[in-house]
C-alpha cells in the first residue's frame, strides 16, 4: 500500500526569461499546526507533511517545470544548470497549440523528486511521474486530458492511499482529478485520504496560506450516491456504511431493509419499514447529512403502502421494482399478489395454506367454468404471469421466456381484482360438494378438506373472540387445534380430530362441514385446552428467543413461565408471568373473559421484540434455578 500524491503545476510567472521566472514563496500552515512551512511549492509542503511514497505532477507545457526542477535538484544537491536552461527555454517556446516540451524532457525532474522523497522519508518507494496535459480549450483537448488523467489509474495499485493537491493550474484540473478518482476507487480499490488546497488568496489577511483538506466535499458526493442507490434500488450498503458514525440505529435498519428487498422478504421488509418512519420523525433535525437524507427516506417509505392491505403492499412493491428495473422481484410480487387479494376478499389472513386454497379454487375446472371471475383470474395467472414468474424463479436456461410488459401486466391485475365479482364462500363449498358427489375427484376432495380446515379455524377464532389475523391463525391451527392438545370439552376434541383427519369420502366431508357449522361457539370453549396451547406457544417463542433446542432447556423454559422471581427481571416476562398465572389457576374452570384477555395479552407479548430478554434473564440462570427446583422436589 503506497501513499500517492497527485499535484498540478501552475504557470506562475509568465516571464519568458528563465532567470527571471519565479514561483512565489509562501508560508503554508495545516489546521492545528502552530508553525507553518515556507516553500514556493505547496507540493513540497505536502510531501514533508504526508511522507508520501511517490508523486504525480500534472501541468501544461507552459507550467514552471524548470522551477520545479531547480527546487528539488538543489534540495538533493544534483542541480544541472544546462538542463535547467534547456527546460526553461522549451517552456518559454511552448504555445497552447504548439508544445516544444515533451514528457521525455521531464525524466530528470522525476528522478530528483524521487530522491527528495527519499530524503524526507527513507522508506519512500519512488516512481514519480511528470505528465503534460493540453490547455483544454475545446472538446478534443478536453477528451485528450481526460485520457491522460485516466491513464494515471495505471500508476496506482489496489489499496493505495491517494492524496490530491488542487492548489494550482487550470480550474478544470480538479474536475478531471475528481472523475479520475472515481474510476480509481472502483477499479483499483484505492482510498482517498485527502484533497488539499493551499489558500493563497488569504495570505494578506492571515499572514499565511492555510492548507485546507476538502475531502469532506468528496464525502458529500458519497452521501448523495448512497442516498440515490438506496431510494432508487433499495441498496443501502453505501449509505448505511456512511451512517454508522452518524446514526448506527438507522444504519442497521437500512441494512435490514436492503437485505429484505434483495431477498424479496416482504413480511420482514414491511415490519422494518413500519418502524423506520417514527424513528425518522424523532431524528429529523439531527446529523450533518442525515437531516437532508430523511425527507428522501420518507418519499421512499410512502411509495411502499405498508399500512394498507397485504395486496396493496405487494402491488406497491411490484410497482417499485418495475419502476427501478428489478423485473424479477416485480413479477414475483405481482404474480403472488393475486392470491393475497383473494384471501383479502374472502376475509382470510394471507397465510401460505390459505393462498394455496385460493389457487386451488381458481384452478378448479368446475368453478372456473361456472364463475367467469375465477376463469378470468386463472387466465391472468396461468396464461400471462405464471410462466414469467417460473422462468425467473427457476433460472431456466432450457427454453426462451415469454415476452413481458410489466406496466400493462400490473395495471391489468389491479383492474381485474378491483372490479371482480366473486361468489360467496359458502356457495363455493356447496358447489364443490355437489361436484365431488357426482365425480369423486381426489384434487377436489383435498381442496374441500383444506376449505373445511379454514372453516374450523374461523369457527375457533370467532368462539374465542380472537382477531382474524396471521398471528392468531398460526396460534389456533398450530397450538389450540394441535392433535396432542389436552381438552376437557368433547366437542372441541371432535373438532380437533376432524381437523387432522384425512377424509377421502364426499359424504363424510359433507357431514364434517355440517358438524362444524352446527356447533355453537360456546361449545368449543375450553380453559384447559387454551392453557395448554398458550404454554406450548410460549415455549416455542421463548425457545427461539433463547435459541435452544435440547429437551431439558425447553423444560426449564416451560417452568419459568410460573416463576415470579425470575420473570420479574424483565417487563415482558413479568407481564407474561402475571397473565399466565391467571390462566393456569383457572384451567379447570369454565371459560371467562379474564382467561381470554390474559391469553390475548400473552400472545401479543410473545409477538413483540424478545431479543433483550436473554440479557436480563440469562439461560444459564434459568437452568441453574430449574435444576435446583427439581432437586428440592426429590
UniProtKB/Swiss-Prot annotation:
- Kindly provide the name given to this protein in its UniProt entry: CRISPR-associated protein MJ1674
Q: InterPro entries, per this entry?
A: CRISPR-assoc_prot_DxTHG_CS, CRISPR-assoc_prot_TM1812
Which regions span the lipid bilayer? none
Other comment: Encoded in a type III-A CRISPR locus.
Q: Which GO terms describe its biological process?
A: defense response to virus
This chain's function reads: CRISPR (clustered regularly interspaced short palindromic repeat) is an adaptive immune system that provides protection against mobile genetic elements (viruses, transposable elements and conjugative plasmids). CRISPR clusters contain spacers, sequences complementary to antecedent mobile elements, and target invading nucleic acids. CRISPR clusters are transcribed and processed into CRISPR RNA (crRNA).
Organism whose genome encodes this protein = Methanocaldococcus jannaschii (strain ATCC 43067 / DSM 2661 / JAL-1 / JCM 10045 / NBRC 100440) (Methanococcus jannaschii)
Name the domain of life this protein comes from. Archaea
Q: Does the keyword Electron transport apply?
A: no
- Protein keywords: Antiviral defense
Amino acid at each position: 500500500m503506497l501513499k500517492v500524491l497527485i499535484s498540478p503545476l501552475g504557470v506562475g510567472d509568465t516571464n519568458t526569461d528563465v532567470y527571471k521566472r519565479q514561483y512565489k514563496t509562501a508560508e503554508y500552515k495545516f489546521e492545528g499546526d502552530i508553525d507553518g512551512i515556507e516553500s514556493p511549492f505547496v507540493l513540497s509542503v505536502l510531501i514533508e507533511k504526508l511522507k508520501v511514497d511517490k508523486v504525480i505532477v500534472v501541468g501544461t507545457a507552459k507550467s514552471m517545470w524548470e522551477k520545479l526542477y531547480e527546487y528539488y535538484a538543489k534540495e538533493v544537491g544534483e542541480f544541472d544548470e544546462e538542463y535547467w536552461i534547456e527546460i526553461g527555454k522549451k517552456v518559454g517556446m511552448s504555445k497552447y497549440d504548439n508544445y516544444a516540451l515533451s514528457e521525455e524532457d521531464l525524466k530528470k525532474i522525476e528522478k530528483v523528486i524521487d530522491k527528495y522523497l527519499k530524503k524526507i522519508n527513507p522508506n519512500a518507494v519512488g516512481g514519480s511521474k511528470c505528465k503534460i496535459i493540453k490547455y483544454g480549450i475545446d472538446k478534443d483537448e478536453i477528451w485528450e486530458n481526460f485520457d491522460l488523467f485516466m491513464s494515471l489509474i495505471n500508476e496506482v495499485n489496489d489499496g493505495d492511499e491517494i492524496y490530491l493537491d488542487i492548489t494550482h493550474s487550470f480550474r478544470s484540473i480538479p474536475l478531471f482529478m475528481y472523475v479520475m478518482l472515481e474510476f480509481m476507487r472502483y477499479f483499483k480499490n484505492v482510498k482517498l485520504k485527502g484533497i488539499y488546497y493551499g489558500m493563497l488568496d488569504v495570505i494578506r489577511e492571515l499572514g499565511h496560506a492555510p492548507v485546507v483538506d476538502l475531502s469532506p466535499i468528496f464525502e458529500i458526493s458519497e452521501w448523495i450516491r448512497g442516498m440515490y442507490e438506496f431510494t432508487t434500488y433499495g441498496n443501502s450498503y453505501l449509505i448505511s456504511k456512511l451512517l454508522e458514525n452518524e446514526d448506527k440505529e438507522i444504519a442497521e435498519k437500512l441494512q435490514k431493509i436492503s437485505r429484505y428487498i434483495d431477498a424479496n422478504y416482504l413480511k420482514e421488509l414491511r415490519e422494518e419499514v413500519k418502524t423506520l418512519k417514527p424513528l425518522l420523525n424523532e431524528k429529523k433535525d439531527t446529523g450533518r447529512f442525515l437531516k437532508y437524507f430523511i425527507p428522501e427516506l420518507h418519499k421512499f417509505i410512502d411509495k411502499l403502502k405498508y399500512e394498507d392491505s397485504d395486496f396493496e403492499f405487494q402491488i406497491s412493491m411490484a410497482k417499485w421494482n418495475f419502476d427501478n428495473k428489478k423485473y424479477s422481484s416485480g413479477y414475483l410480487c405481482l404474480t403472488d399478489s393475486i392470491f393475497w387479494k383473494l384471501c383479502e376478499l374472502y376475509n382470510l389472513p394471507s397465510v401460505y395454506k390459505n393462498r394455496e386454497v385460493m389457487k386451488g379454487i381458481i384452478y378448479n375446472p368446475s368453478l372456473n367454468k361456472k364463475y367467469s371471475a375465477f376463469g378470468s383470474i386463472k387466465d391472468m395467472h396461468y396464461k400471462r404471469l405464471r410462466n414469467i414468474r417460473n422462468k425467473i424463479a427457476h433460472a431456466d436456461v432450457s427454453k426462451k421466456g415469454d415476452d413481458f410488459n410489466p406496466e400493462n401486466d400490473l395495471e391489468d391485475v389491479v383492474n381485474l381484482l378491483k372490479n371482480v365479482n366473486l361468489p360467496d364462500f359458502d356457495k363455493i363449498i356447496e358447489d364443490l360438494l355437489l361436484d365431488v358427489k357426482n365425480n369423486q375427484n381426489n384434487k377436489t376432495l383435498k381442496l374441500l378438506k383444506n376449505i373445511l380446515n379454514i372453516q374450523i379455524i374461523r369457527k375457533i377464532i370467532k368462539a374465542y373472540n380472537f382477531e382474524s389475523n396471521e398471528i392468531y391463525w398460526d396460534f389456533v391451527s398450530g397450538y389450540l387445534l394441535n392433535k396432542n392438545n389436552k381438552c376437557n370439552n368433547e366437542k372441541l376434541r371432535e373438532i380437533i380430530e376432524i381437523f387432522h383427519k384425512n377424509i377421502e369420502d364426499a359424504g363424510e366431508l359433507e357431514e364434517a362441514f355440517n358438524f362444524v357449522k352446527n356447533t355453537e361457539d360456546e361449545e368449543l370453549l375450553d380453559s384447559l385446552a387454551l392453557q395448554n396451547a398458550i404454554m406450548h406457544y410460549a415455549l416455542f417463542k421463548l425457545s427461539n428467543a433463547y435459541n435452544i433446542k435440547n429437551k431439558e432447556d425447553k423444560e426449564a423454559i416451560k417452568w419459568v413461565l410460573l416463576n415470579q422471581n425470575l420473570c420479574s427481571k424483565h417487563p415482558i416476562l413479568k407481564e407474561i408471568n402475571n397473565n399466565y398465572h391467571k390462566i393456569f389457576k383457572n384451567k379447570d374452570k369454565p371459560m371467562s373473559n379474564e382467561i381470554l384477555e390474559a391469553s390475548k395479552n400473552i400472545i401479543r407479548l410473545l409477538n413483540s421484540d424478545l431479543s433483550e430478554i436473554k440479557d436480563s434473564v440469562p439461560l444459564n440462570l434459568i437452568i441453574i434455578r430449574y435444576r435446583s427446583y427439581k432437586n428440592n422436589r426429590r
